[in-house]
Amino acid sequence: AHLDGWEPFPRYEGPHKTHALDLSRTATHVYLSHHHEDHFDPQTLREIGPKPIIMGAFRHTGFRQQARALASRLIEIENGQCYTLGKMRIRIHAETPSYRTNSVLEIDTPCGKIVNANDCGLDASVLQDIAARGKVALFFSTLNVLANGWPFPYLRQNESDYAVRVAAVREQVREAFALGMKILKPTVSVAFAGPVSFLHPLSAHL
């Protein structure tokens, strides 16, 4: 569901996408972290074919209906509840308040614990609960230091507080990632660099 992005960005086409789709077709299940289009792309899901979809039991009725229509089976996991899938144990931690659809995925595998925070806000108490259940081998989370998400599409460079607001959000992003590493103490941390590369013209204003 990650293979296509927001519509203003260049379409992801060509051999790299073909290869990614071929790999995706071998997957047994699909995890949907949240409703944003760079994580939930219905066309991509149609292209890889119906598969069991795993997601949180969100309040967003439209999201759930869309996922159900695309899945061979929809598996909705209540917040923090354990779901067994083969040799793995899965937990989904939904972001609060409950109207949000963001989620953190915690997977216990025979090879170690994986935590994928996606774009979700990190809650210290949730991270502490995860850490208490065992050593984290891999921690994935966003580190969009370009800060090209909200509120920056609504700002102009000539605004007097532009630089201050950009710097504040960038610092929040760094602090959140550092908090995750501090609490989880993972063997390896992997940062998502954000939806647009630094040299892309869409980031020129930064």
Region locations from a protein language model:
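Pre-active-site segment of Zn-dependent metallo-hydrolases
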Residues: A1-Y31, P42-E47, L122-K135
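Metal-dependent catalytic neighborhoods of phosphoester/phosphodiester hydrolases
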Residues: D41-P50, P201-H205
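Active-site-proximal loop/helix segment associated with metal-binding centers of metalloenzymes
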Residues: H2-F9, H93-I114, C120-S125, A131-G134, ...
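Cap/insert and terminal regions of metallo-dependent hydrolase folds
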Residues: A124-L206
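A conditional alpha-helix N-cap/helix-loop micro-motif detector
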Residues: R11-G14, S98, C120, V169-R174
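Active-site neighborhood of phospho(di)ester-bond hydrolases with catalytic His/Asp-centered motifs
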Residues: A1, T26-F40, I54-F58, V115-C120, ...
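Active-site environment of divalent metal-dependent phosphoester hydrolases
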Residues: H35-F40, T61-R64, Q81-T84, S98-T101, ...
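Metallo-beta-lactamase
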Residues: K51-G112
